[in-house]
């Protein structure tokens, strides 16, 4: 059983790390998966409660999938989906306020060409105050680590039998060190 850094106030005691996989079909965290569909409204949705409220706009999440975009930073879609992913993982951990280091991946082919832009996109605001499913979240984004896709997912696992061993043999991770993120 993994122990999380909690306090009774629903605020994390110290930094927490949250990994997000920004897929076109789904956003994935260590404990949650949801579809990437996103629709923006000026008024609170009547039917759905599965929305992010951010800067006086309402973004209904997860009712479809996004289409492929060669550059995920051209719209605010993945930024809003990141907020939903942060909220999902924080809710799982019993938190509503935290200092967060965000760990994300990029396809290997995009690492050199898009890492700096992805960093600027996700770190454009360090103090986040938003609601998800009518619950308020406050996040101090104190860091961002970018890894080649697949690396962050493998790093946390103790043993991974089967085909996943191919990934491990390519990157050779040994504890207690961890791979260096891409600058």
Locate the predicted segments by residue.
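Nucleotide/phosphate-binding catalytic cleft detector across ATP-hydrolyzing
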Residues: 1-166, 183
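Short, intrinsically disordered, charge-balanced linker/junction segments flanking boundaries
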Residues: 164-174
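Single conserved hydrophobic/aromatic residue that forms the stacking wall/gate
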Residues: 172-175, 179-183
């Amino acid at each position: 059983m993994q122990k999380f850094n909690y306090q009774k106030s629903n605020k994390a005691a110290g930094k927490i790390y949250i990994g997000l996989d920004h897929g076109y079909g789904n956003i994935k965290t260590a404990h949650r998966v949801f579809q990437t569909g996103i629709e923006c409204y000026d008024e609170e949705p009547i039917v759905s409660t599965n929305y992010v409220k951010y800067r006086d706009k309402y973004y209904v999440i997860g009712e479809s999938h996004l289409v492929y975009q060669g550059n995920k930073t051209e719209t605010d879609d993945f930024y809003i989906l990141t907020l939903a992913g942060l909220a999902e993982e924080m809710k799982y951990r019993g938190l509503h306020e935290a200092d967060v280091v965000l760990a994300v991946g990029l396809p290997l082919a995009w690492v050199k060409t898009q890492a700096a832009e992805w960093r600027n996109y996700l770190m454009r605001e360090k103090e986040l105050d938003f609601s998800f499913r009518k619950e308020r979240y406050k996040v101090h984004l104190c860091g961002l680590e970018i890894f080649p896709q697949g690396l962050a997912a493998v790093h946390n696992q103790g043993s991974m039998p089967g085909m996943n061993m191919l990934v491990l043999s390519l990157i050779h991770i040994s504890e207690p060190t961890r791979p260096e993120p891409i600058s």
